[in-house]
């Protein structure tokens, strides 16, 4: 046979070898695929939870008498295991204890909660039970596995835009256009700084605290309010025109400030000596003192000026002092103006005890520059630094000054054009703080300079506005990016923002693309839960403050309430009785935790349809959720694929319908950084040579580099040097040819662009994207089969996905298998310690599929770390196995595969090829009611003994019983309501005592379509000490197993979006067959390929057939080649004993037909000969699996396909992959050759057993009296308007009348009809539909009267009677309803 050099064999495990056609051979392995949430939750429990709780303490009483202080917290070990939580429908959680103390500062006493009794498990107060995460990243809540989906949101930061809107809480939006910088904090109010389109000065729009409206300020008013003087503002911005015009547009300057109403009035009060009589708030004292200082200084100056010998030096000194006082006054008044406009509370201060020293400016600084109130978060600071640093605006700009280092040496000369090399140098020196470009901000109040020392520096560089003319300069101000630990807003940030805006009209700076992934980040479970915990802690804080305020004697109303309410906590207690428990109520904390895991939008049932669906659920990200995007939002830009998604978010896998583009999947290698930004790995390229150094880049960092695509690996020397002169690479959104020496990085793998599910589709590159999307989504819907087989044509990631799904049992340590049975594997390690691995047996998943694990190792096997020990559902030898390899032909067959219908052979039905197991859980509760307790019993009234034949003596079904719909699973009786007894019943009760109970049957029965075998019973009872909900005495769960064979109406699909419904099951002998007698398994319509453009399925078909033929060839060759025979168990994934028996039996069979050498086998050993030998050992062709891996974007190409077909004995040029087919019914060959091959087909969750449904009678809607809809409500099929037209077209008047009356909403008519059918009478005439009654009532509701006009012209008023009254019924059939106009009515009618 011809050796194909385009492949290599890859061994994934001792039983899995694939012929690998990948072209890129780097050894980069992805991290644990579902791992991102696991690490986030671990960080939350170990670090963040304590930080959040601790940040709210100490809590002090208003007068400082008491304080509640925090001394740490402890999470105890869980009381039950994960397995027990699942089995007993409990939550897998651990108790949180918080150690608090109550300090009385007057007496010095400290009260704590100590661990006094065995009942209290730890020191401190019990706060809540915190659910714990399993190793697989899920939570077990009430016995159900749940998962928290990561949310993708806009990152906090500064954004440069030309259009923006401020959303207000009353559903209004304020739109703004121009040169805009949007400051988007993690916590705090949104701010816009902008130059409007028709204005020439800078303004700021700030949303007020309530979010009701947005206020506009001149930028200089804000800067003054924050503590900058007009002189300093002009100095910082170098007398920029926009800033000068902003100063002119506002009121707060030395000329106009004294004319301000409050100040003018105060001056008049001082002059008239009324100052002492004017009462003022402590917060107003600061500016009033400043006015007083100004008045005194001004008086002194006037006296000097009026004196006969004025001292110029002293006057100059006084002028300086007056200037300082005025500037301080301007700042304070500007701050007051901002605070009042934004409705900022002046009470909610941290420093409450020092009210006399409080000023409006200090409140404003506290509101905007304090993390508790205005938080940028680490992600926001990271974005601020990247956007507002000077280097961001220097690219391709000419420097208008010498840039020197701290020693005075010129690093970059004036006139230098800043290109990548110079910019890299500038960035490096700037980060190291080695450039002499750093300036300091000076506040008017000197104490602020010391308070904000670390954060009031900025960088400044002069550049030319025009690179060519160089006649005008402008300055660029940027933040000092060396300290990224500051998570609050700073004055330097605001100055840098203003600088950015005023330079935008000169095209200095870049606008932001809001859909770029660098501007979005992931909120993982730690952040989502953090916001909920903060809500709970705020409520607890408020409760503690209220209690302490009452105890402090500060709240008279509270004291009165306590006196009036003798049951209140503190009303009956003296302050000496105050304890930690009496001032704290952890209930709000418990509620938010419970709500998060039960009702939060992003907390979902874990999709356990199969291992792939579970894994993709854990890698899903959603743009919806609290503060996210609504699914009704029509914005296509949000949903569209963006170039920055490359390697981070899959461009293929997303739902169809309303959620398209809002729910996404992480790409195969995607990870996240500490700030929540998505990263993807690249290999570093240095001087045209690919190194082994892997770096993970965020979308923003990637924008700085030139990155080559993975196809560049095709021509690489042994040392990693790229041999091509030019290679395809991308820079931001554009692709071009680059010299390898210009390239910075290269992709680690061609599949890094797609998700886990999309990477399972072979020949993905040959499929249309919309079909690939369907293929990726439908693999998640595949039902786990009884006998799964991994695909012959795979992509090489099947083993990795199975391993990371959490359903594959893998060895923790190396060793030897010492014990194996269906439920347990024991491995003895190298240290002679044994480890037991318990296997799941027939467990119901969230999607009612069967999760079962079966061992794939034998006693004596040597085991390596992470080697597969037992397969989970949809797995074979540790590989993902969602479907079956079946022989498919593309041909029509009597029209049965028209419009995507599928014809299958009954072999798939008889041999259980597509059979699956489903487990349904039925639950019944035994309740305590006001009429008495319900009872689970076998003694059920009005039920025959035959109906109770499978119930045990307690009334519960026996395990193993085969049940049909309507059968009783659990017998239960409920007490009837209290009714008056008849004399006869009273007599019987008097004779028999109280034995005759008034009970009714309320048993649990098998619903429609619920036939199966009872597999298990779980009983929970208060009597046995189980925890149940209030008023529940006993809970019984019954598990019924169904084995579902494939049938007409089931949905099947390939991996390329080629889906269809089974329309006919044909006998195997009637199916078309190949010339060697092999019958086809499935017939697909050839018209399903061209328009869908999913040609990948055709490639898979031919490659799969070549693999099947190669398996036969390898088996025959192994009969004459001892070396190959020894390897065959690994090639086929069979047990060694079975492989040896197979070869031995085949050799004997060949001898019986006279074949003794390999040369003789070519024409004499037929398919049927191999089939006979396989059947002797209980095997099928599916067990002869010669597996191939063709990874996405780098797998089998046309040359490889032709080579492997030739190797398998198929002439690709002569046959084109098409074969002569013979009709099984007639024995006649088809007219032309037909494409036949092996395709991997899945049985999907959409099974006809779940959908098929019939109704004779059933429930009706209360209002319309029409039948309900849907299977769950035993509803009918809606006969709509168009269906009515169809009957009208055929003139089927009687059918139509039936459908619109007795089969719909003619209440009396349907009852009479039912009665007639039961008694065998003829069907009566229909009456008036309820919808007509509804119409009359709605018209009467509009104030209109309705009259009935009879044939004899008599009129009857029907406004006070029902139109379906029996006495009217006969007349109405022959009546006409009069039309009316308003003119017909007189006043008496109203």
From Swiss-Prot:
EC number: 2.7.7.6
UniProt superkingdom: Bacteria
One example GO MF annotation: DNA-directed RNA polymerase activity
Role: DNA-dependent RNA polymerase catalyzes the transcription of DNA into RNA using the four ribonucleoside triphosphates as substrates.
Listed GO biological process terms: DNA-templated transcription
UniProt catalytic activity: RNA(n) + a ribonucleoside 5'-triphosphate = RNA(n+1) + diphosphate
Quaternary context: The RNAP catalytic core consists of 2 alpha, 1 beta, 1 beta' and 1 omega subunit. When a sigma factor is associated with the core the holoenzyme is formed, which can initiate transcription.
GO cellular component: DNA-directed RNA polymerase complex
Similarity field: Belongs to the RNA polymerase beta chain family.
Keywords per UniProt: DNA-directed RNA polymerase, Nucleotidyltransferase, Transcription, Transferase
Disordered: region residues: 556-576
UniProt protein name: DNA-directed RNA polymerase subunit beta
